């Protein structure tokens, strides 16, 4: 049976703004308070989805969250009508209003961790929504994330959904941004690779000093248990604390994997040789041949990697066995990074082609091509069981483009978030979107 790796990209929400909410994310912090363009952001994301579909990849779409999150503000003590809640928050606690309006759910690499059926004990695809407890504005996402994923992957014969881990620092979980999977074929058993920044309970593990480590070893282990993974199909690796302090807040900012290949920076991990040996050995027992592509610090510094988002790229398998790297425009703008990529594709290795996309609106908030997608490996039967409304087609692309043009503003500043009209605009748009994507009622305003 044929299997696919399907990329489900996050649709950028109507409140996309530069709130500077993510400490440890250099781009997010440095572009704080600038005027954003939600319409352009959403269209840039849709163009990437359509381009991958046109290249022959199966492409899906993941709906944004309801924002402003009035329920979250009510939980923090604001009351009255929805408009009054927003006005009170704007007057007395503007940072809370900004957080409740964040469109960060577009970065669906943080939505969940996904294990395909070939790896799990019960032969189903498993999803665990990420608690994202390190940042308040993201910690409020997982209830809606779970409902949206449940509406997309509803058939319990094929799909299993787990609630987010306990919302405490010891189980900080950032989802697929710290997880990848190596395999010979998407439909065969593989090795799941969990990357953590610190241990919550074992002080022998080093930790970053400047920025927080958002993923714990204990969270990764819990997800592996929930998904019914075997020990011989799992590798845990610690990210280098020094690169976290340099702005590498998720592993997908310093490494990307696909198939049998890990593309990573020389400084990405601790105990790199041991980690590579374990990956090689475990994948070898499953009939695969693990290969690594290391980018030397002498050619690309960590600073250049963070600035260009070289590793926050999509590594995709072509039908001929070669690989394609999808990178943001910022890679072409960085002379050292672009020179490295030109040499990489000319070397005759597995990565034969680089395609560049303009994702400036997302990039300025600290999210590149890899942040915008959640990978789900599915066999033909499972793909047929996915809600067809969320699979990208040419007609769906046209419909969503028209939907964005109709509902989204082309400029948004922090002061605009206090406008009660924005709430009505967003709810009207999302109500229409759930009909387009055939999701049913998934948003709080539709349920309560």
Swiss-Prot record:
Record-listed substrate binding positions: 19-28, 110, 137-138, 214, 252, 365
Top-level EC class: hydrolase
Pathway terms, separated by semicolons: Amino-acid degradation; L-arginine degradation via AST pathway; L-glutamate and succinate from L-arginine: step 2/5
InterPro entries found in the cross-reference section: AstB_sf, SuccinylArg_d-Hdrlase_AstB
Active-site residue list: 174, 250, 371
Catalytic activity: N(2)-succinyl-L-arginine + 2 H2O + 2 H(+) = N(2)-succinyl-L-ornithine + 2 NH4(+) + CO2
EC number(s) on file: 3.5.3.23
Keyword field: Arginine metabolism, Hydrolase
GO molecular function: N-succinylarginine dihydrolase activity
Keyword Kinase on entry: no
Hydrolase recorded as keyword: yes
GO BP terms in the entry: arginine catabolic process to glutamate; arginine catabolic process to succinate
Family: Belongs to the succinylarginine dihydrolase family.
Oligomeric and partner information: Homodimer.
Protein name: N-succinylarginine dihydrolase
